[in-house]
């Protein structure tokens, strides 16, 4: 679906997208480089211009579908986690084949880096369906530490000293990375159905969580801020029959790096921008015609990327060759993301 005149009129689709569902998008923290992992067993990196046009910079092949990808703090490396239980490192400077740097006993669902931009060798963090999170020094073949979770890792994110791990059974493990081998506390998701995504608030004060029930929640780590916790409904529409709603999964939540406002995107093919402090929707956008599986703002918040592809919500039979697969760059109008009453930080 192309919106030639409305709020999506300036959106640009990147050339040569993956041939199968896109599992995750990841922007470089320091440049307009966009990585995407896919079920087609690749990780692709694009150099995106400010206008949203992108040029392929690198393509790395994996031996299995890739479920997650992330940039290193300096933007020079990309880590990918695959269904064969491996995580592989791609060095964009050296340009060599992806090298295995981590291993699990089940698919690697999520990968992140722990380290500041000035750190030469950041720590890789991998979360798996084998119910563990492992920390890796990329110069060694054994994990530095292993965190035993209560269930399979479904989603994971990291910001500053905060690691949040969402598992099966609606559990959420909160880890303070100053004590990375210990779970600081475990909470039950405020949402009643399966977790689809978890994203740290940029100031590391808490996290946002999305589920299959068309609902998003916010939870703060400090219990003195528990009064600020809240949930809200989104990605729903009225059905043809009265008093009935079609409910869609919230597939991703992304934060604007400057304003800390955020986006939600769902299986209904729509995305919206929100103000968490005012509990207010800033801007909604029309459907793009297929599920949105992953999203992300670039490092300065001027470009919003979203992946359109099958999200597996109806099983493998519906993943047909006719299903659209593309990555789109949306130029962000500052007024769409700027809160009406900014909070001093």
UniProtKB/Swiss-Prot annotation:
Metabolic or biological pathway, per its Swiss-Prot or TrEMBL entry: Secondary metabolite biosynthesis
Pfam families, per database record: WD40
UniProt WD repeat ranges: 15-49, 59-100, 101-146, 250-284
Keywords from the named record: Repeat, WD repeat
Recorded family membership: Belongs to the WD repeat rae1 family.
Function of the molecule: WD40 repeat protein; part of the gene cluster that mediates the biosynthesis of oxaleimides, cytotoxic compounds containing an unusual disubstituted succinimide moiety. The first step of the pathway is provided by the HR-PKS poxF that serves in a new mode of collaborative biosynthesis with the PKS-NRPS poxE, by providing the olefin containing amino acid substrate via the synthesis of an ACP-bound dec-4-enoate.
Protein name: WD40 repeat protein poxJ
Organism: Penicillium oxalicum (strain 114-2 / CGMCC 5302)
Gene: poxJ
